[in-house]
Amino acid sequence: MKIKHTLTLILFTVISYSSCYTQSLNYGDISYNKAVNISGKQRMLSQKMSKAYLLMAKGVKDEKIKRELNSSKFIFKKQLQILKTNASSSSTRLYIKKIYKLWNKFDVLLSDTPPNVSTSKQIIDLNTSLLKACNDLVVDIEAKSNYDNKFFENNNQELVKIINVSGKQRMLSQRLCLYYIASVMFPKEKATYRTMLSKVFDEFDSVIGYLLINGYNTTESEEELGAIMAIWEKFQTNKSDFLDGKYNLVEVYSTTNAL
């Protein structure tokens, strides 16, 4: 299995492991575990799309990046529709409505061709609002799983945390690349973006150890996490160079995708 699939492997493992506990814990026609995973993936996609657009605007020519942007847009819209269709509470529907409102603006920006610096700046300014709205939905769905279905009576507190943290880690790897590009692309705002980059760097670094020692790991996922830690060490041991933008953009893109 390729390293870039490791967090997906962890999510699949913990969701499968918990199936005997969660058959009656549903978010509409899907389980709460799957709903947390899907809504968590929306966070990652918001950053992945932003990153891809900025890379193209910066002049990185790679058809893979263009395909990544287009497929991420399609998946984001499809998953948002799934979450909307299965939402039953008024609060959840309100969170989804807010995401749609932001997404409509965001989608227009992502569709602005050819990719350019001016639109890239607008994407940077809006991406955190979309990310926060997606995260608010994750938190709401987690709360519903606890309140409506007594989820935590099955001693699955750690399981829900692992699903959320694994999804968040996928988002952070994309956000790392996004703000690395922004710090290089917008020299006047470099200090601001460098501060954000440092914050994301530290948050990503702090979570890897937790994922490594959680009780739902398999031997395979532990080995893959070890491989991720080896890749991450390149940036971890040269944090100042990373924050100062001394790595090639394509290298950062490839490495963060592998994380």
Predicted segments with their positions:
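N-terminal secretory signal peptides that target proteins for export/translocation
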Residues: M1-K2
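Sec-dependent N-terminal signal peptides
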Residues: H5-I15
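Hydrophobic alpha-helical segments
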Residues: T22-V184, K188-L259
